[in-house]
């Protein structure tokens, strides 16, 4: 088994449980903003619409088709419209509240804290994330995992975003390690895995849903605890 000198991690959907935290936040806001009084038929419909719209916007962002500001301004405007809210003028206030409260949630993916406890004494750990600068740091602080990481690299700080090799090269420059001595762990085949591979970095694809794919990965896991046998 190859030995590594440093480990890079994605944050959302790999360590920080975005789906659970988003649902928790949206459930609170759905009630606070009285969305059923505004024409939404159910919270489940609202949540499913959000997930679809959010996935579409982040996919477009990752492909370089839109900027982060478009996500901020369009996400809940679209959700409101598609769930039957006639007056969408409150969507920006809803969005601002969501962005403020979401990062305060603390849910991590199963076994995330345990594997960080295991890896932290053995490797310098670094986060590499495309998320908003202010929200990503708040997520890490709220979840109580900041002390595990020597570096937290956001796309804003690096001046480039995954899957560009430049963000990985920036991260390696901060750590002082070479690409061949690093490994990237993430859940997204395009941004995390293909991006790291293009930078010459080995990859570990975190695939808890066991999705079928044809991508080339160095290793693949379905549970974070499997990292113990690889690192």
Language model region names:
Residues 1-7, 20, 113, 117, ...:
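Asp-based, Mg2+/Mn2+-dependent phosphohydrolase catalytic module
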Residues 2-110:
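N-terminal helical cap/lid subdomain that shapes the substrate entry/recognition surface
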Residues 12, 30, 61, 123, ...:
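Generic low-complexity, intrinsically disordered sequence content enriched
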Residues 35, 81, 104, 118-121, ...:
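Secondary-structure boundary motif
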Residues 53, 121-122:
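Structured helix-beta-strand junction loops
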Residues 60-62, 100-101, 121, 152-154, ...:
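A short, structure-level motif marking secondary-structure boundaries and short turns
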């Amino acid at each position: 088994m190859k030995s590594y000198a440093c480990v890079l991690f994605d944050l959302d959907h790999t360590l920080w449980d975005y789906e659970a935290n988003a649902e928790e936040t949206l459930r609170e806001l759905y009630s606070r903003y009285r969305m059923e009084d505004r024409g939404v038929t159910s919270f489940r419909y609202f949540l499913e619409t959000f997930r679809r719209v959010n996935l579409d916007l982040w996919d477009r962002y990752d492909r370089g088709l839109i900027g982060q500001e478009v996500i901020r301004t369009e996400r809940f405007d679209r959700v409101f419209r598609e769930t039957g809210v006639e007056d969408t003028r409150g969507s920006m206030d809803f969005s601002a509240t969501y962005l403020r409260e979401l990062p305060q949630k603390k849910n991590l993916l199963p076994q995330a804290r345990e594997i960080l406890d295991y890896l932290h004494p053995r490797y310098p750990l670094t986060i590499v994330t495309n998320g908003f600068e202010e929200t990503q740091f708040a997520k890490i602080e709220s979840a109580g995992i900041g002390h595990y990481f020597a570096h937290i690299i956001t796309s804003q700080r690096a001046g480039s975003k995954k899957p560009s090799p430049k963000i990985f090269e920036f991260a390696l420059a901060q750590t002082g390690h070479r690409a061949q001595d690093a490994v990237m762990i993430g859940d997204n085949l395009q941004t995390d895995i293909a991006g790291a591979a293009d930078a010459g970095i080995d990859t570990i694809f975190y695939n808890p849903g066991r999705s079928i794919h044809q991508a080339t990965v160095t290793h693949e896991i379905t549970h974070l605890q499997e990292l113990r046998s690889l690192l």
